[in-house]
A protein has these predicted regions:
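A cross-kingdom marker for long, charged
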Residues: 218-274
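Structured, acidic catalytic/metal-binding patches in enzyme active sites
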Residues: 2-6, 11-219
Length: 274
């Protein structure tokens, strides 16, 4: 932590969102990070200190949320064609993931775990994500932690609508896993977040090489833009009672369907901090 404090810098994207004489803040995060990113930058720290609550996508400190997440990971898995399951097992073994984990839980979770294993090879870990840094700071100062969504809301957007869609998701994920360009795309995304490069993030769909199939495009739209109206509702509701520091994945911030645009349309004054 001492090393992180020595390298403390503002990373990501931060807006002040104001209405009714009250200021809240909207922070675009990256869900995985590096140990040296755990210390908050000065403007992030100062903005968080001005608020009365931290709002994450889900409140992982809530015991009911913890139970729901545990139940979700232990849910039934889908049956995949033999050759596809064999390919998934091979990728799983190559990433040194526990073989028994493939025997339970939604197939979509397995896809997410495979992507996270790729990120870890590039030094990015959920433990060091922006949410972790904000959560630790808020717990130390006894700042209330709230959730913008329920676990079920996230599951509804993450899980495939059918066995056929789940199979397509696995095939797309394995193709991405084999693609030698994938590490460069993740590095570009990471660099854009670190620098707060909103313009590059706005062009993500054009350069990520991750929206090449109908399944990928539909899943992305559902997972990102599709959740924004509900989170905007939650931020608006919380802001009516308390100044809130809302921390949400950075891709939820871009374009006309992004959270800054949605809140501006609801009468908030939006000011970029960094």
């Amino acid at each position: 932590m001492q090393r992180a404090q020595q390298q403390a810098a503002d990373r990501g994207l931060l807006w002040r969102v104001s209405r009714g004489g009250r200021d809240s803040f909207l922070y675009g995060t990256m869900h995985a990070g590096r140990a040296e990113w755990l210390a908050l930058g000065p403007r992030t720290e100062a903005s968080l200190a001005r608020t009365g609550a931290l709002a994450l996508e889900i409140n992982v400190m809530d015991p009911a949320v913890q139970v729901a997440l545990r139940d979700a990971t232990q849910g039934p898995t889908r049956r995949l064609p033999g050759e596809l399951m064999q390919s998934l097992r091979a990728a799983w073994a190559a990433e040194c993931l526990p073989a028994e984990d493939l025997q339970a839980g939604p197939t979509e979770f397995h896809v997410a775990q495979l992507a996270m294993a790729q990120a870890q090879r590039q030094g990015l870990f959920p433990l060091y994500g922006a949410e972790s840094a904000l959560l630790m700071r808020s717990l130390r100062t006894e700042r209330p932690v709230l959730g913008l969504e329920t676990v079920q809301t996230q599951l509804d957007t993450l899980l495939a609508r059918s066995d056929e869609e789940a199979e397509a998701m696995v095939r797309d994920a394995l193709a991405d896993w084999r693609d030698p360009r994938a590490p460069r795309m993740l590095e570009r995304l990471t660099r854009a977040w670190v620098r707060g490069d909103l313009k590059d993030l706005e062009g993500y769909a054009d350069w990520c090489d991750c929206l090449n199939t109908p399944t990928e495009r539909e899943a992305f739209a559902r997972l990102v833009d599709g959740r924004n109206p509900g989170m905007a509702d939650a931020i608006e509701r919380l802001h009516a009672d308390v100044s809130v520091f809302a921390a949400v994945g950075a891709l939820h911030m871009v374009g006309p369907a992004g959270l800054p645009a949605l809140l501006q349309a609801r009468g908030f004054t939006i000011t970029r901090v960094f």
